[in-house]
Amino acid sequence: MNLIKISGLGRAIMHQQRAMELNGIEYTLDPKDSYDVVHINTLGLKSKHLAKKAKKAGKRVVYHAHSTQEDFRNSFIGSNLISGLFKKWICSCYRRGDVIVTPTEYSKSLIRGYGLTAPIYAVSNGIDLARYEPKENDREAFRKKFGLKDDDKVVISVGLYFERKGLLDFVQMAKDMPDYKFIWFGKTPLYSVPHKIRKAVKTKLPNLTFAGYVQPDELKQAYVGCDVYIFPTLEETEGIVLLEALAAKANVIVRDIPVFDWLNGGTDCYKAKDKDEFERMIKEIYEGKLPSLRENGRKAVENLSLIHISEP
């Protein structure tokens, strides 16, 4: 399966297309068609060549900066060793843009620090609010699919098999909390990630499941049907899965890192500094010692709807 399609980047591209459709903006996916502006999301040689060709033809180039040196680290085998080279490469791509768009003020600050001179705009990847509106049977459908009882305590997370996604902490939480079911959605080819991640994914625990990639509608059911969604990531440019979870009115705990400063801890969601705080908050949410913030979370992303972020 194409890694881009099942990643946040693939989701971001779909959001861009949907936002243009909602606003009646024509677009094409064929570079041979007639167009005024080229919007590039990827970092391969073909993308870089397309930007160069478009500029030569007098077209305007928007380069979407989804990647940073910081979120490349702690991902694939050798990513830390070559992160400096990766930074040079992405900068050479982003310099092709007349403007650069990136999802958050946090990622904008990182990219500005790379010495790029083009205007940089922070625009959220957005969320399709209607698609993630909870439905009455979502919880039941999720629990039936995964063989879960109604009173099972269920914690989920979503992401590629990367260390920076907090996967090692997630597995340790499952070890520490045997009376809770932990399910991780998303996947990455195991040959591409370090040994410690492969070992973690192969961990055999009765309360730990690596469910792999599931379709967006099934994932929405999981957001609705779990007791707590956690995002233990250590580095992000935004995190579309977080927007999805908030829109689906999940009980959300994120790691307390700068990219999530736009969320108010204790109001929109809960924020944990480390594994121990995640574990404490999971228990306190389930036991009712911490109030549910489901409705507040949904409100927090209402201004990030696709129609809203794509307004002129």
Where do the model's predicted regions map?
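Nucleotide-activated donor-binding/catalytic signature segment of Leloir-type glycosyltransferases, i.e.
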Residues: H195-D217
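Aromatic "clamp/platform" in nucleotide-sugar-dependent glycosyltransferases that forms part
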Residues: L234
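Glycosyltransferase donor-sugar binding loop
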Residues: V158, K181-K196
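Membrane-proximal helix-turn-helix segments that form the acceptor-binding/catalytic region
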Residues: L81-I100
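Conserved small/polar residues in nucleotide/adenosyl-binding loops
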Residues: I307-P312
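Conserved acidic donor-binding segment of nucleotide-sugar-dependent glycosyltransferases
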Residues: G266-D276, E284-K289
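Short alpha-helical donor nucleotide-sugar binding micro-motif in glycosyltransferases
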Residues: Y94, Y213-V214, Q221-C226
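Short hydrophobic beta-strand element within catalytic cores of glycosyltransferases
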Residues: N251-V254
